[in-house]
């Protein structure tokens, strides 16, 4: 498993895999992995992916004003061990500065749907999710 922290390293690994005819599967997470995350890797494998990128990024834009980003659970060593068992190829663990550089602003407005269900209690949550998913698929 290659552990990378930059967008450039991730793009290089994905480009090399594609150049060898690999089908890339991406599983975005915020870490503290559980069986649900691991099942997504297995579904990607069963769907034909043969090169796997998992991201671990605790996205500050997904947290509401009264939610404690600092208290979000993290256990990198456990996450590494679980991902090794799944034989993933690349683990992308960017910093906040990498994903949100000061000279670039990216926003996504999910619209009225973002104010229902979970969004009714967590303003900005779904917009934050949409931004990071957009960036990860870019």
Give the location of each predicted region.
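Nucleotidyltransferase catalytic core that binds NTPs
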Residues: 1-138
């Amino acid at each position: 498993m290659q552990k990378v922290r930059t967008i450039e390293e991730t793009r290089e690994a994905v480009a090399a895999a594609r150049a060898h005819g690999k089908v890339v599967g991406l599983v975005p997470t915020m870490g503290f992995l559980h069986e649900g995350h691991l099942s997504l890797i297995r579904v990607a494998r069963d769907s034909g992916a043969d090169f796997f990128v998992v991201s671990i990024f605790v996205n500050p834009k997904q947290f509401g004003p009264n939610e404690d980003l600092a208290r979000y659970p993290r256990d990198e060593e456990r996450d590494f061990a679980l991902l090794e068992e799944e034989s993933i190829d690349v683990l992308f663990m960017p910093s906040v500065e990498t994903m949100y550089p000061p000279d670039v602003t990216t926003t996504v407005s999910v619209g009225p749907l973002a104010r229902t269900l979970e969004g009714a209690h967590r303003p900005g949550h779904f917009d934050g999710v949409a931004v990071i998913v957009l960036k990860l698929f870019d």
